């Protein structure tokens, strides 16, 4: 009989053969080394991941909404009171999403003295498409010198793309693929509409965020999303910059998405033991959990209504929270409640004193710029920082609601854990708003017409003025016969 060479035991004492003893010893050493490596990795995992810096680009031209009301022949207050808008930013054919993204990113890099070699991810959120193949991110790589090892591309879903780019960046830093470098998120759009009721809800602007560990603004581990197929707002016509919009349906989609992400976020936060006194199993009690709330801002009036809607969610879970309100409203059919004007009006009034202290500061930029689409919620967040101030924000939690038609929505939150005065200084929002040129409605219409004429053109030189542009702003100079775009920087 042949003895197997694989036998590892011999003798009555069951001793291991020397070869097997050595193999076992080596295995133990390897396991010990792996444990050491794992312990070391745990010690070096990034902590306090969040926003280290923010920059915002607000175009230097705007139109006053009161003047636009007169120009459009609508009733006084339709745009200013009905929509809650004061001014609307716009650009002519000299600026596009490439130039506006280059402008805000270059300003972020310069204002925070960022070493671009230490950036390992750059992602862009936008719905303002110039090319169906080439990404905005690839254009921005011109600012990174010899650093070509940079992950990330563009992400698209209406106004939600900036948030998805942010989540991707946070996930990358917290993953095993992280190489120790920081990330940058760029988001923004040019929001314009065809003539009609939606035109005053436009706007323009870009935001860039520097993301990394040891940040003064740290994102919480809880977030919730709601995704659904809906034709509330979409852009199927590539021959035009204008969207197709089902206005009333889109408002309902926004409110429904807010309800759903609030319920999901509440359940997750409660299950993690983060909520001390919830309103119910799926309502965490907004007024006790969040110190401030920031929203995607199609219009400021919608945000005012939406904050009241959050309180209504708590009321449905526990009517005793607001004993002054008729308890019968808590039992209304849910679908009917989405468009119930009595509920809406009641909770706008209930929320009014809290809105003044916790939301209004975030709306100063949006009411003066209009909708920046993907940058909207982050422009509102920048507004909150600027008009509340670093001292009053210390230790405070901010809830953020991001919405993109089609639809995609998320509720997430961050906490201010360090001094943000330097961020407020670099944002320089008050001066940026003050230095703008307020154009006439005719000037606004002329700028939109220039954009219409420039759309999809090649062998084209833009006709718009650059006199209003400030130093450091990128602008379009030429589109050649192969649609390749050239830019310059205003001196």
Swiss-Prot record:
Pfam families for this protein: HMG_CoA_synt_C, HMG_CoA_synt_N
Superkingdom as given in the UniProt entry: Eukaryota
Knockout mutant characteristics: Drastically increases HMG2 half-life.
Annotated GO CC locations: mitochondrion; nucleus
UniProt EC number: 2.3.3.10
Protein name in UniProt: Hydroxymethylglutaryl-CoA synthase
Extra facts: Present with 34800 molecules/cell in log phase SD medium.
Naturally occurring in which organism (per UniProt): Saccharomyces cerevisiae (strain ATCC 204508 / S288c)
Protein task: Hydroxymethylglutaryl-CoA synthase; part of the first module of ergosterol biosynthesis pathway that includes the early steps of the pathway, conserved across all eukaryotes, and which results in the formation of mevalonate from acetyl-coenzyme A (acetyl-CoA). ERG13 condenses acetyl-CoA with acetoacetyl-CoA to form hydroxymethylglutaryl-CoA (HMG-CoA). The first module starts with the action of the cytosolic acetyl-CoA acetyltransferase ERG10 that catalyzes the formation of acetoacetyl-CoA.
CDD domains from the UniProt entry: init_cond_enzymes
This protein's pathway: Metabolic intermediate biosynthesis; (R)-mevalonate biosynthesis; (R)-mevalonate from acetyl-CoA: step 2/3
Residues found modified as Phosphoserine: 276
SUPFAM superfamilies in UniProt: Thiolase-like
GO MF entry, a single one: hydroxymethylglutaryl-CoA synthase activity
Gene Ontology terms: biological process: acetyl-CoA metabolic process; ergosterol biosynthetic process; farnesyl diphosphate biosynthetic process, mevalonate pathway
Stated family: Belongs to the thiolase-like superfamily. HMG-CoA synthase family.
Residue numbers binding (3S)-3-hydroxy-3-methylglutaryl-CoA: 159, 201, 250, 296, 305, 371, 405
Keyword vocabulary terms for this entry: Lipid biosynthesis, Lipid metabolism, Phosphoprotein, Steroid biosynthesis, Steroid metabolism, Sterol biosynthesis, Sterol metabolism, Transferase
Catalytic activity: acetoacetyl-CoA + acetyl-CoA + H2O = (3S)-3-hydroxy-3-methylglutaryl-CoA + CoA + H(+)
Active-site residues (renumbered): 127, 159, 296
């Amino acid at each position: 009989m042949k003895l197997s060479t694989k036998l590892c035991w011999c003798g009555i004492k069951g001793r291991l053969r020397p070869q097997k003893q050595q193999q076992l010893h080596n295995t133990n050493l390897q396991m010990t080394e792996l444990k050491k490596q794992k312990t070391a990795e745990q010690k070096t995992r990034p902590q306090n991941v969040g926003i280290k810096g923010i920059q915002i680009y607000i175009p230097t031209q705007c139109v006053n909404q009161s003047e636009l009301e007169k120009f459009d022949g609508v009733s006084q207050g339709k745009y200013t009171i009905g929509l809650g808008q004061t001014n609307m930013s716009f650009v002519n054919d000299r600026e596009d999403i490439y130039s506006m993204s280059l402008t805000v990113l270059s300003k972020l890099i310069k204002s925070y003295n960022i070493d671009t070699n230490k950036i390992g991810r750059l992602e862009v959120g936008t719905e303002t498409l110039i090319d169906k193949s080439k990404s905005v991110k690839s254009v921005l790589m011109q600012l990174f010198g010899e650093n070509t090892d940079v992950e990330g591309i563009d992400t698209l879903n209406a106004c939600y793309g900036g948030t998805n780019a942010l989540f991707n960046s946070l996930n990358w830093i917290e993953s095993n693929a992280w190489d120790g470098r920081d990330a940058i998120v760029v988001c923004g759009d040019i929001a314009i509409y065809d003539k009609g009721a939606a035109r005053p809800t436009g706007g323009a602007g870009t935001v860039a965020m520097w993301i990394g560990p040891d940040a003064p603004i740290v994102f919480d581990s809880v977030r919730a999303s709601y995704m659904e197929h809906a034709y509330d707002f979409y852009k199927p016509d590539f021959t035009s910059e204008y969207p197709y919009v089902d206005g009333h349906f889109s408002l309902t989609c926004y409110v429904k998405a807010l309800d759903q992400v609030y319920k999901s976020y509440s359940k997750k936060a409660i299950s993690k033991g983060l909520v001390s006194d919830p309103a119910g199993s799926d309502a965490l009690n907004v007024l006790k959990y969040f110190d401030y709330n920031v929203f995607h801002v199609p219009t400021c009036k919608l945000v005012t209504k939406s904050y009241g809607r959050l309180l209504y969610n708590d009321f449905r879970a526990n009517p005793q929270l607001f004993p002054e309100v008729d308890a019968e409203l808590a039992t209304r059919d849910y679908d009917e409640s989405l468009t119930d004007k009595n509920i809406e009006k009641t909770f706008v009034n209930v929320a009014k004193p809290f809105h003044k202290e916790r939301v209004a500061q975030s709306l100063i930029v949006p009411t003066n710029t209009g909708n920046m689409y993907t940058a909207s919620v982050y422009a509102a967040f920048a507004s909150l920082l600027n008009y509340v101030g670093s001292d009053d924000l210390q230790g405070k939690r901010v809830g953020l609601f991001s919405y993109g038609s089609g639809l995609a929505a998320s509720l997430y939150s961050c906490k201010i854990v360090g001094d943000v005065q330097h961020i407020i200084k670099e944002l320089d929002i008050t001066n940026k708003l003050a230095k703008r040129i307020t154009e006439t409605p005719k000037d606004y219409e002329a700028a939109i017409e220039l954009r219409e004429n420039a759309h999809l053109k090649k062998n084209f030189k833009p006709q718009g003025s650059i006199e209003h542009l400030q130093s450091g702003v990128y602008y379009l100079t030429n589109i050649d016969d192969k649609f390749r775009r050239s830019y310059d920087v205003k001196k």
